[in-house]
Amino acid sequence: MRNPLGLRFSTGHALLASALAPPCIIAFLETRYWWAGIALASLGVIVATVTFYGRRITGWVAAVYAWLRRRRRPPDSSSEPVVGATVKPGDHVAVRWQGEFLVAVIELIPRPFTPTVIVDGQAHTDDMLDTGLVEELLSVHCPDLEADIVSAGYRVGNTAAPDVVSLYQQVIGTDPAPANRRTWIVLRADPERTRKSAQRRDEGVAGLARYLVASATRIADRLASHGVDAVCGRSFDDYDHATDIGFVREKWSMIKGRDAYTAAYAAPGGPDVWWSARADHTITRVRVAPGMAPQSTVLLTTADKPKTPGGFARLFGGQRPALQGQHLVATRHCQLPIGSAGVLVGETVNRCPVYMPFDDVDIALNLGDAQTFTQFVVRAAAAGAMVTVGPQFEEFARLIGAHIGQEVKVAWPNATIYLGPHPGIDRVILRHNVIGTPRHRQLPIRRVSPPEESRYQMALPK
């Protein structure tokens, strides 16, 4: 358990304590309560240096006051986006006001057919973004901007039957392997800090918008040259939908949503810790600025009132600021996974779980046998896919919460998996001992077969 007490030194608090301590001691020196001056001086030192859950006493007083002021006010909404053309003809970037910052968004496109292997609780994949690279690009091309790297997604879905979801949660355990995850870079421009850069392009807000649009385009291009597929956003719709928590009211330790609760945390363990916590929805934010240490926060949404996971620290009194990116905690540079880990397809010879994403491109999936078919369809349903099977699979569909149709398929919002031949799209082969993709012709795996899954195979037509 984390020690709630800590020490923090700052020049301002040290000067204030050193200035007040001598008068306190002198004031009581000639009285019978001479010890009171020493006690007051000691109390001042404690107030100036000792923290409780990351804040001094003065910080807690300020947090309570700020929370009382804003708790009955609805959160500030972002302005309507405006699309501004860059110097490239036909290339557009949407910008909008978010508080006092003008922002633009860059979507990171996942690399298709990228497996994730979990080794000792750590996710290994080559679909990653180095936060240090983002800081380096900002330092070179736009040192007066800062960037928020925001990932949003979920470990398991909610479209399948509850028994199916519960079983899949047991199978994957605490693997940091979200079934769905999308990542954006939000570039933030402070009008005061960027005044000189903006004035080189135009006067006032027009110059600021042009500078931000050009910077977003340049950062996206440089990321692509480093192997990270990035596209400037023409709207904020997908980002807003992925990060919406249905805000209703801020409480001291959580945010009440329309039908769920969201809590903001500090978690120094990095993405492997962030994505291993059980939650219905997860949002992570890492802020990067040239010459400054990265800062992060994690928001976990659950149907019931949240309990703090191990390795996490609740940001009491700062839930709404954390949601809006105003209350972040210092962290270190790390490698951030970009896309979904996907569906559990097997394990390595060393019993390390292997996950494969199927939610980014359309494919025709060839499944080796009835058990492989059952496992993939059941796990895909638990991972949030909409499963459609033929009329002869009526009992199977009822058990897992699937639909009945003429075409057998597994559909995600941005991709459809056809369980059979389909012209014009890539073909993937999944067997009990191998998975073959356009990127990995023969990736050896071993089957993971929890006994509880066998009852779904028994529901298949004979």
Spans of model-derived segments:
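N-terminal alpha-helical membrane-insertion module
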Residues: 1-80, 430-462
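Short small-residue beta-strand/loop micro-motif enriched in glycine and branched aliphatics
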Residues: 2-4, 113-117, 363
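Amphipathic, interface-forming alpha-helical segments with heptad-repeat character
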Residues: 114, 129, 140, 152, ...
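Structural flexibility/helix-modulation signal
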Residues: 142-184
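Membrane-proximal, solvent-exposed terminal domains/tails of membrane-associated proteins
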Residues: 169-170, 174-462
